[in-house]
């Protein structure tokens, strides 16, 4: 199934890098690709004036129709052309199954300096236009900022997928030739259009799904010798969840990773740490809570950009907050801990942050036990009785621990 709608968006109201399109990108990709890129820009402008009206996919199906007959599907050459624009970094493509919508995000061309810093771009340009013409172009191009796009599964092709010295056709990192052989063994003779290939390749690259795993999803999605793309995506999503579920369940259910780390099985500790280290913060958040809200994504971006905290440490903080607050999302709690991470400069130090969590949790546990035994009024350093006190107690313990470590270091010297 193809999407029912599409949209084209771009960052700038007008692009200042069109000279780069004709003098650099166009030399590599050809006139047809450049023409389609310029059409996307005008389409983005048109859609911007009608932002409340969704654009049906039929417009894209028939935009370049020269035969007079209406197309049922988007022509393959359009997907191929978009794939080349993706590989050149001029378009980023996102597919929303929920909205049944394909989004093409137009990226402004790189400046001449940045373009030539990409070795494969430079080599392909020289190969396409010759050294003499290339030297003539080395004088007058300005740097232009790039943009970022979050959310959804990105299925953008890389450069090598379309532009190598020996191959100019659309290709993917997933081995579709070997995959077809496996399908034939199952008496399935199915051909994949470019969109289906892009979806399969996207899951293969981003989630490292094996050929066998993808085969398990494709076989039940074949209906009348055609792939039901909507069903295939659901099966792929479920496969990703199943592959990550055991390790995520370990993280969610074992709060002793912080509270009783010393007595926890090494295998369990390693599994939890791998989860922290291997997943980006957005995906880890989704696996932990089952869904992701916009305010959660905003906080993740803030931790990453404003505080400069690495994803592996963000995952550690989010996990600690998860069990500390009975699976509830507590933004201020997370920010307090992020401030302590920034203060003690452990932005990228996973082990140091983990050690601090473990020490503080252990001390908090001992203090609570002592308080219960004494049945006395809590002192200033006593165990916290509410969330705010809990955060302050944690920060004070970290401060005391670091102070003690510094003093011990002085005595040793």
Curated annotation (Swiss-Prot):
This is Uncharacterized protein MG349 homolog.
């Amino acid at each position: 199934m193809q999407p029912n709608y599409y949209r084209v968006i771009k960052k700038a109201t007008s692009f200042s890098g069109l000279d780069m399109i004709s003098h650099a990108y166009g030399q590599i990709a050809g006139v047809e690709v450049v023409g389609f890129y310029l059409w996307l820009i005008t389409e983005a402008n048109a859609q911007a004036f009608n932002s409340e009206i969704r654009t049906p996919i039929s417009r894209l199906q028939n935009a370049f129709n020269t035969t007079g007959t209406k197309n049922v599907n988007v022509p393959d050459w359009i997907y191929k052309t978009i794939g080349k624009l993706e590989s050149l970094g001029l378009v980023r493509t996102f597919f929303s199954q929920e909205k049944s919508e394909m989004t093409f995000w137009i990226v402004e061309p790189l400046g001449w300096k940045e373009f030539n810093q990409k070795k494969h771009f430079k080599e392909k340009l020289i190969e396409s236009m010759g050294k003499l013409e290339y030297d003539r172009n080395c004088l007058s191009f300005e740097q232009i900022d790039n943009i970022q796009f979050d959310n959804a599964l990105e299925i953008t092709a890389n450069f090598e997928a379309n532009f190598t010295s020996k191959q100019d056709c659309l290709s993917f990192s997933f081995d579709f030739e070997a995959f077809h052989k496996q399908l034939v063994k199952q008496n399935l003779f199915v051909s994949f259009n470019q969109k289906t290939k892009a979806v399969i390749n996207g899951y293969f690259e981003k989630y490292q799904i094996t050929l066998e795993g993808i085969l398990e999803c494709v076989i039940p999605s074949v209906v009348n010798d055609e792939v039901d793309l909507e069903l295939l995506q659901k099966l792929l999503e479920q496969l990703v969840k199943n592959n990550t579920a055991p390790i995520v369940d370990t993280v969610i259910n074992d709060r002793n990773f912080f509270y009783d780390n010393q007595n926890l099985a090494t295998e369990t500790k390693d599994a939890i740490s791998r989860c922290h280290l291997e997943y980006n913060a957005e995906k880890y958040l989704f696996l932990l809570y089952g869904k992701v809200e916009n305010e959660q994504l905003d906080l993740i971006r803030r931790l990453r950009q404003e505080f400069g905290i690495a994803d592996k440490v963000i995952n550690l903080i989010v996990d600690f907050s998860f069990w500390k607050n009975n699976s509830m999302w507590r933004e201020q709690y997370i920010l307090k801990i992020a401030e302590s991470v920034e203060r003690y400069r452990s932005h990228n130090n996973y082990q140091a942050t983990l050690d601090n969590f473990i020490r503080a949790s252990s001390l908090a546990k001992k203090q609570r036990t002592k308080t219960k035994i004494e049945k006395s009024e809590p002192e200033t350093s006593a165990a916290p009785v509410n969330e705010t006190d809990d955060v302050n107690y944690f920060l004070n313990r970290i401060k005391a621990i670091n102070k003690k470590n510094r003093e011990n270091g002085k005595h040793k010297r």
